[in-house]
Amino acid sequence: MSLLTEVETYVLSIVPSGPLKAEIAQRLEDVFAGKNTDLEALMEWLKTRPILSPLTKGILGFVFTLTVPSERGLQRRRFVQNALNGNGDPNNMDKAVKLYRKLKREITFHGAKEVALSYSTGALASCMGLIYNRMGTVTTEVAFGLVCATCEQIADSQHRSHRQMVTTTNPLIRHENRMVLASTTAKAMEQMAGSSEQAAEAMEVASQARQMVQAMRTIGTHPSSSAGLKDDLLENLQAYQKRMGVQMQRFK
């Protein structure tokens, strides 16, 4: 796996699923391929994106700044600086300085990532802030190691919380989660179906599913009534794709 592929993988792992994630993935691909060279426009676009947490925006801004060539005097962005200040905790800043000194001795991506993984997310963000604010310089490869270590820690905690939700025994939370998943699956089906004639069927199924979820929420139904809703939808989608000659079996 190439370095940039690895960076893209780690960074995208902390972005919530949805149309915005696909957009960010495209921007990252363009940046890494050297196609997008207007850093200022890119940062302005990032700043105004909804849903993303300030830290995720800060990390993406840091990655864009590392990758896109820019004039020396280009102003640093406040939204990135604020996100990478370790919550203003002096303890984080002290640790960030220690980490920075260690990173200065590293020359490889993996070496930097290993060193960084033993620090807290706050210290890692502060260390990125040091580099972003030009208070310290490391090679791009080492900076990417720091980015990936930070993303790995964030993704770990997101995964733990996601697993807690998925394995919860609370039937109301499970019921709501199934309805949310069915609704987002229906939305994705509508987007994929496009405007071909054969798409009408898939659109109809998706529309019915969304109406059903709406009705279930309006009248309040038994928590077990949503079981299998998303899987039924996915089966419909796969049947539609088969008729279209598309084979994608890995949705579940």
Swiss-Prot record:
- Recorded GO MF terms: RNA binding; structural constituent of virion
Q: Which UniProt keywords apply?
A: Host nucleus, Membrane, RNA-binding, Viral matrix protein, Virion
- Annotated region Membrane-binding: the residues are 1-164
Listed GO biological process terms: viral budding from plasma membrane
Q: Where is this region: RNP-binding?
A: 165-252
Which Gene Ontology CC terms are recorded? Answer: host cell nucleus; membrane; virion membrane
Location in the cell reads: Virion membrane; Host nucleus
Coordinates of motif Nuclear localization signal in the sequence?
101-105
Q: How does it sit in the membrane?
A: Peripheral membrane protein
- Tell me its family: Belongs to the influenza viruses Matrix protein M1 family.
The record describes the protein's role as: Plays critical roles in virus replication, from virus entry and uncoating to assembly and budding of the virus particle. M1 binding to ribonucleocapsids (RNPs) in nucleus seems to inhibit viral transcription. Interaction of viral NEP with M1-RNP is thought to promote nuclear export of the complex, which is targeted to the virion assembly site at the apical plasma membrane in polarized epithelial cells. Interactions with NA and HA may bring M1, a non-raft-associated protein, into lipid rafts. Forms a continuous shell on the inner side of the lipid bilayer in virion, where it binds the RNP.
Its quaternary organisation is: Homodimer and homomultimer. Interacts with NEP. Binds ribonucleocapsid by both interacting with genomic RNA and NP protein. May interact with HA and NA. Cannot bind NP without genomic RNA.
HAMAP family for the chain: INFV_M1
* Misc. comment: Most abundant protein in virion. When expressed alone can form virus-like particles in transfected cells.
What's the protein called, per UniProt?
Matrix protein 1
Taxonomy, top ranks, is: Viruses, Riboviria, Orthornavirae, Negarnaviricota, Polyploviricotina
